[in-house]
Amino acid sequence: MEEYILEIFNSREELCAKYKIDNIKILRLDDEGAKTKLALIKTKNFNLKFIFMYYDMGLKPQLINFFKRNFIILGIQSKIIRIDLENNVIDTLVDFSIIPFFEFLENDSYLIAIFEMGISVINEDGELKWKLELPEILIDWEIVDENIKLFYFDGKIGIHSLKTGELLS
């Protein structure tokens, strides 16, 4: 499978000027406005796959290549999106509505999506294992064995099982 790259543009004009694209189909996650950006997904050889328009919350989207399977995972806005590259099918795995996506973490078994006040775990088949809205804003996190340790803004610490999402302490 080819490696896919994510590139961010401030406007349609900026995108079209760089890549000389005229008629582009844009998948809209939000209406076009002052704070929208464009996320272009392509191969290293510029085989254009998808362009998303999204509301810029100030956090950069992140793309994960699932080399074992023929799909990629995009964390953008408050969503986790799975893109099936064989069939060009896009599925939203997680949508926390207004809770911003921060980053992905990976271990041998799972892809963990960290949000401002949420967490979700995706298995190696690209399926959502579990998701959890959290009671407080996250300020830090780390994987410890088969668990994830979450540090909250209010000073509390929680440890959850990556396998089940169960709160262990």
Locate each region found by the language model.
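Short loop/turn segments that connect beta-strands within the blades of beta-propeller domains
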Residues: K68, I76-S78, E86, N107, ...
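Aromatic (tryptophan-biased) beta-strands that constitute blades/sheets of beta-rich domains
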Residues: L40-M57, V89-P100, E127-L134, L168-S169
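A glycine-rich, hydrophobic loop/mini-helix early in the fold
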Residues: K44-I90
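Acidic, small-residue rich beta-repeat scaffolds with periodic aromatic anchors
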Residues: I5, I143-S169
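Conserved beta-propeller blade signature
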Residues: I72-I73, Y110-I112, K149
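Repeated scaffold domains used in trafficking and secretory/extracellular systems
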Residues: E2-D30, I51-R69, D95-D108, L134-N147
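WD40 beta-propeller blade core
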Residues: I81, S120-V121, G158
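Short loop/turn segments that connect beta-strands within beta-propeller blades
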Residues: L85-N88, N123-E127, L162-T164
